[in-house]
Amino acid sequence: MSLRCLYLDLDGTLLGRGASMLHDGEGRVSIDGVRAIQACLRGDVEVVLMSGRRSTQVQEDARLLGQSSYIFEGGACVVLEGEAQWLTGELQPGEMTIAEQIERSGAPGMLLEHYSGRLEYHEPWHTEREVSHLFRGLLDVAEADRLLAECGHGGLRLVDNGVVSRRSEALAELPHVRGYHLVPASASKAGAVAFHRRARGYAREETFAVGDSREDLACAAEVGVFWLVANAISRDPSIAAEIAAHDNVRVADGANGTGVYEAVVATLMTG
């Protein structure tokens, strides 16, 4: 069966240091990410970017790759041929954005107060978001989700988006810092991948995905093959324990764009 679509994460996966497509994770010049996209386009494989980034950012990145569909804010919305499909359950944009509705609920403030010294907004990327509230820090996501439910915010969940490099002095004592998205409970990258795949009429076996986080890894349930880039393991060894839950996950030898190129070539050759 021929391959028809790649679902591809941006930060920490296709992009290297400084969110550059032309540099690896160490800042060295690399065109492997470009070669990966080129291989897909030559093979008539659609590339759907999936990211926690804001819509305007992912839209421009998709346009630069010649693609008309993309997934933004951690799966909260799928844009298909220019039409937004919100996967946010009862929370829908209207007079207020979904992010404003979440703010009004009090959930973000509750989390910041409860996890004082362990959680803060991920400045400067936390503004102008349509859906999610973006934090950084270090906490137990399962515990945070239980706290949300106990405080009447069961319609929301906190998503672990992996290790991040920036922090303020308030978090200086933490051993490392992770990025977190507060989103409607129904929003996920896996759900967005499933929606797009059904809309396009792709069989699961006709698709594959590449990423670097637990949220990305959950997409394995919706694609034929899922690849983790090598830096996913080196930056967060604990993610390796979750691979066993899937029988279609492979780990690339290469990091960032080099790992993406490895995944694309290997999958196209065997697909």
Predicted regions and their residues:
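Charged, glycine/proline-rich intrinsically disordered loops and linkers
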Residues: 86-105, 159-178, 237-244
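Active-site phosphate-binding/coordination module
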Residues: 28-125
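Asp-based phosphoryl-transfer active-site loop
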Residues: 4-23, 49, 220
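Conserved acidic, metal-coordinating active-site core of Asp-based
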Residues: 113-222
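Glycine-rich phosphate-binding "P-loop"
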Residues: 14-27, 177-184
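Short, flexible loop segments at the rims of nucleotide/cofactor-binding pockets, characterized by
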Residues: 23-27, 47-49, 185-186, 205
